């Protein structure tokens, strides 16, 4: 599971660096003066619902706001949105009712897909000679059905692959998807 995946993708886009040794959500929680769970809700409200005066005082959101405005301006002028990694072009007509926020969301979803698209072959290559298999991919997590004899090797190597590019991960385990617990 990627830690604060959307937030970290956005940080890459805008050139913002989160402090080392702390999650992105905790960093923002400290700036808001709230607990972690409340901060997550606040952050996503700001990112997908717009900024208020409090958010505009936070350097991360100042950069986000500038980036979103510039992205939208380029989109309106060029008539297309170009994805960051694969340079795919999404034509104006494909984004119905385009707003600053909607165009940004399209870009962010495209970026998460492109980053994962680059990581999946590396994960599959690592697992190719193993009994363990990747059985599910979501936007911010890969589910590996891990053979017990390979657990330590998987935990020792897979996070390195997943964290390439500066995206920290947390590993969970359990007998099924509904009872996963974090591995410390």
Task: Locate predicted features.
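Short glycine-/aliphatic-rich beta-strand segments at the starts of folded cytosolic domains
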Residues: 96-117
């Amino acid at each position: 599971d990627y830690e604060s995946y959307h937030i970290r993708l956005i940080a890459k886009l805008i050139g913002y660096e989160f402090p080392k040794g702390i999650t992105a959500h905790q960093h923002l929680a400290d700036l808001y003066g709230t607990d972690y769970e409340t901060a997550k809700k606040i952050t996503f409200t700001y990112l997908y619902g717009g900024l208020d005066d409090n958010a505009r005082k936070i350097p991360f959101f100042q950069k986000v706001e500038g980036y979103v405005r510039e992205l939208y301006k380029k989109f309106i002028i060029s008539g297309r949105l170009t994805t960051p990694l694969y340079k795919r072009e999404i034509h104006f007509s494909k984004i119905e009712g385009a707003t600053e926020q909607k165009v940004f969301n399209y870009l962010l979803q495209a970026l998460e897909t492109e980053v994962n698209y680059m990581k999946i072959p590396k994960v599959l290559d690592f697992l190719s000679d193993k009994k363990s298999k990747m059985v599910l991919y979501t936007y911010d997590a890969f589910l590996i059905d891990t053979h017990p004899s390979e657990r330590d090797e998987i935990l020792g190597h897979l996070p390195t692959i997943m964290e390439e590019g500066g995206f920290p991960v947390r590993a969970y385990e359990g007998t099924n998807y509904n009872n996963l617990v974090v591995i410390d």
